[in-house]
Amino acid sequence: MGPKAAVFELSHIDKSFRDRDEVIHIARDLSWSLDAGHNAALMGESGAGKTTLMNIIAGLDHVDSGDVRVGGQSLTTLSSSELTDFRRRALGLIFQKFHLVPSLSAWDNAALQARLAGVFAADFAEHLFETLGIEHLRHRHPGQLSGGQQQRVAIARALMHRPQLVLADEPTGNLDEATSDKVISLLVEAASDAGSTLVVVTHSAAIAGHLTSTWRLASGSLIHAA
């Protein structure tokens, strides 16, 4: 049996865009992969391209050249509809803004992606809500929840379908320091329970300390910082 495929793999990718008369390089012949059982913090200065790199891994942005694979599947070969279906099944996405549906309860918001993917499992949903400390909030709507509670619901939504890969872009950017530390700790624990590899974009060294490795993006290159 051959070696197990990396959860995601960027192979010699290039990505740039023009800002007035200047060419901004997000990636220059950049390669990066992460195996199952590992997670990573992605750091860098503002404008370095961290969010763009995450969008490339998620298939939300294209590369100028190179290959992007998730679970061994090349995203560059998929049609738009195939990519949407693949993303729904294989990825969990968490953003600084929670994007919860106001008319749905916390439970139905969290179950949304798993139900769309046809893999909703009530027992795992119960486990996630207990792990994240929101089991008593299941019937409340987003407007009745604090920012930290809403982010925990968003985390449950991203993990409930047990995706191969979870990408979190500044997931605690709107939370205070104490709440942020608690939410990141719960995110790492819940991702492990779901069997998901986790990548977190952050400016915070404290948050990066919760992850097993830290990478820094600068001038189109990645440096393994810790």
Could you say what each language-model-derived stretch is?
Residues 1-16, 223-226:
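ABC-family P-loop ATPase nucleotide-binding domain
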